[in-house]
């Protein structure tokens, strides 16, 4: 949390004695927020870790260093840099691995189906565990989950790098996805903890999105360089030194905030959630790869049964992993729908665009990867800009602007054919990516801001589950559009669907914003 001067907002201040014989000041401010501040400076440490946390309406109880500052400014910068870099390395790994698939198949004698599962196993475990990881942040503390997720991701990156067979690699990728599922929602929860001011938080979430955009842009380039010079295993080894530094920074500079949510563990809710999301993700992946057939009907019925059971259990549980009452808040529900739509269109279009370059134009994977860099780099500009726009105006306006620009960009790709100059394709894809990246910080901020502080972790889990589910559905549904034999017509249908989904989401946001 950034440094603050609480004196201007102080309503009541009294001195108390702590159990550690230290003198503290109890400070009640007009935020309303309660703080406990050391009466005497702690000269041995620039930061006093949080030891207790309670709610007072929307306020929080902190133990802070003398003067009321949660952190020194330089400590805060290191803490937020650690969070952003953690998200960066997760996104970097995803794009690097995609570039490495051909070399993995050649070295480990993998079939096309097994290579697809190198990606899909990670996607499945990541999507299935986001909700559980978000809940764990609220129950056990976001710093702890973030740290454990980084360590888990590093361990199974090593396992991937050492894999002697496709089976072991696919298993290691699935477990690597577990670590990623812990890092992503906990990074958002940590941002929420460090920045209680909504405008400042929106700016930081904009940087969070930019970190993902930079990773997506650099991934194909770094991956191509590593694979061509040292082999595909380097795509996994590259994670280790980065995460080693991140673990040290996390322990040193990110406070261990004491969670406010109940410590009770919703076993049935967790189990039905994981089964539902795992089966749903698996069904959509196989549907996109093989098409629909009646053999999948029993699995679909099991998914619907588990989802229904999950909702009933959560409704009746006094301390559920997923408080359904969160969806009564319009801003939270709208942001979750927008998150789904953003990833549905963007990643679905990204999939068909890569095939347009490779299958339709006949470009190599390396050249196709470079051709997609303009769209990936759009996030570097758009995410921070979207965060600042949200802070200056409002979240609904930022979502509407981003969705409108994205709808225009996606729909305009309908003019693309084999003779279209690449400069025009790059401009249109940049526009589509810009819209997505501009709207995403606002949607994420709206979800986090709409819930009580003690549910920041599960809020991050829900918005990221919505996004990840949107990605899986987008790739499957838009992928089907280009599988009918006439690639160009299918590509045009796919981008029109992507643009239409953005346009419908923009209309929904506009209606929600209207008084």
Which residue stretches match the model-derived regions?
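Hydrophobic transmembrane-helix bundles of small-molecule transporters
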Residues: 50, 62, 206, 228-338, ...
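12-transmembrane solute porter fold
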Residues: 76-92, 97-99, 112, 229, ...
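Extracellular/periplasmic helix-loop-helix junction of adjacent transmembrane segments
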Residues: 100-128, 366
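Structural signature of transmembrane alpha-helices in multi-pass secondary transporters
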Residues: 122, 126, 177, 208-216, ...
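Helix-loop-helix hairpins in multi-pass membrane proteins, especially solute transporters
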Residues: 138-268, 453
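Glycine/proline-centered helix-kink
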Residues: 212-224, 277, 383, 471-476
């Amino acid at each position: 949390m950034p440094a603050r001067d609480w004196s201007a907002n102080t309503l009541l201040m009294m001195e108390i004695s702590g159990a550690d014989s230290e003198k503290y000041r109890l400070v009640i401010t007009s935020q309303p927020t309660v703080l406990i501040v050391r009466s005497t400076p702690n000269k041995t440490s620039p930061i006093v870790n949080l030891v207790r946390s309670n709610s007072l309406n929307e306020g929080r109880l902190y133990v802070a260093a003398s003067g009321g500052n949660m952190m020194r400014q330089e400590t805060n910068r290191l803490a937020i840099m650690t969070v952003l870099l953690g998200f960066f390395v997760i996104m970097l790994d995803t794009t690097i691995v995609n570039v490495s698939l051909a070399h993995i198949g050649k070295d480990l004698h993998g079939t096309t189906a097994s290579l697809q599962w190198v990606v899909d196993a990670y996607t499945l475990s990541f999507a299935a565990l986001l909700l559980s990881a978000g809940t764990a942040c609220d129950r056990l503390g976001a710093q702890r989950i973030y740290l454990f997720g980084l360590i888990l991701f590093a361990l199974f990156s090593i396992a991937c790098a050492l894999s002697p067979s496709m089976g072991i690699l696919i298993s290691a990728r699935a477990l690597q996805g577990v670590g990623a599922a812990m890092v992503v929602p906990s990074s958002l929860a940590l941002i929420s903890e460090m920045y209680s001011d909504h405008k400042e938080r929106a700016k930081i979430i904009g940087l969070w999105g930019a970190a993902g955009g930079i990773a997506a842009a650099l991934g194909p380039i770094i991956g191509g360089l590593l694979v061509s010079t040292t082999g595909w295993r380097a795509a996994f080894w590259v994670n280790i030194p980065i995460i080693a530094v991140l673990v040290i920074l996390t322990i040193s500079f990110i406070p261990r905030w004491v969670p406010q949510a109940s410590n009770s563990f919703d076993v049935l809710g967790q189990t039905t959630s994981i089964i539902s999301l795992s089966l749903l993700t698996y069904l959509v992946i196989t549907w996109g790869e093989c098409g629909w057939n009646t053999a999948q009907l029993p699995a679909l019925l099991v998914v619907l049964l588990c989802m229904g059971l999950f909702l009933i259990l959560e409704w009746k549980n006094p301390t559920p992993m997923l408080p359904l009452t969160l969806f009564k808040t319009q801003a939270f529900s709208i942001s979750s729908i927008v998150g789904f739509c953003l990833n549905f269109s963007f990643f679905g279009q990204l999939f068909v665009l890569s095939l347009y370059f490779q299958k339709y134009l006949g470009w190599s994977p390396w050249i196709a990867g470079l051709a997609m860099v303009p769209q990936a780099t759009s996030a570097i500009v758009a995410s921070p800009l979207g965060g600042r726009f949200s802070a200056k105006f409002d979240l609904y306006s930022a979502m509407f602007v981003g969705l409108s620009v994205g709808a225009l960009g996606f729909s305009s790709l309908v003019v693309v054919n084999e003779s279209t100059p690449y400069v025009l394709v790059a401009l249109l894809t940049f526009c589509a990516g810009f819209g997505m990246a501009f709207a995403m910080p606002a949607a994420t901020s709206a979800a986090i801001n709409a819930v009580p502080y003690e549910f920041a972790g599960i809020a991050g889990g829900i918005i990221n589950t919505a996004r990840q589910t949107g990605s899986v559905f987008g790739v499957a549904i838009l992928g089907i559009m280009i599988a009918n034999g006439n690639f160009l017509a299918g590509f045009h249908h796919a981008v029109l669907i992507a643009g239409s989904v953005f346009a419908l989401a923009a209309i929904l946001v506009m209606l929600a914003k209207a008084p």
